[in-house]
Amino acid sequence: MAILLHFGVLITAFLSSHVEGKRDPILYCGACRALVDELLYEIRKVNPKKTVDVGSFRISPDGKQEQNKVPFAKSELYLTDVLEEICEKMNDYGLYVDPTTQEKSYKRFAPRDNEGIGSVDFKNFQFNPEESNSLKYACERVVEEHEDEVLSVITKENDNLADKLCTEETGLCKEYLHNEL
């Protein structure tokens, strides 16, 4: 009897570790796109002339060090630091319902440092504190599960970063495609 109980507990633990709830495609796609939007904003704030040495700090047999200079804003060092805090900015996003198509997406409603508040159409946003927390959680999951892809795309690519990361690399927007944030 005790063996059956242990076996039942093991099977339940095994199955529960492999079963994941269905992710809301709008939420996770929105979190990924908002993540890219915030990363690009942070990158634009850094002086483009600022560089950092990357590469091996080992000395080759001929006495030379293999190092390269890369823009600081696109360095793994800087991006990793930014990623640690980026999901806190998800509170500045809300669920937006397009008045024409009724398509839902997450858009930024809070103005940044130099932006005015006049360009935001608040009547089509659905403000809900639980949605904000869900978006932050989804962002944290995206960073946790896809950090390597995020760093790779941001450091190597220049165009269509949201599409490249969120659709091609992670597949988070395959079910739910957007044109803009």
Curated annotation (Swiss-Prot):
Disulfide pattern: 29-173, 32-166, 87-139
Localization, UniProt: Endoplasmic reticulum
Regions crossing the membrane: none
Recorded GO CC terms: endoplasmic reticulum
Predominant place of localization: endoplasmic reticulum
Locus of motif Prevents secretion from ER: 178-181
Segment forming the signal sequence: 1-21
UniProt KW Transcription keyword: no
Keywords: Developmental protein, Disulfide bond, Endoplasmic reticulum, Signal
PROSITE patterns registered for this protein in UniProt: ER_TARGET
Family, as annotated: Belongs to the canopy family.
Function text: Plays an role in early embryonic development.
Name recorded for this polypeptide: Protein canopy homolog 1
Organism: Xenopus laevis (African clawed frog)
Recorded name of the encoding gene: cnpy1
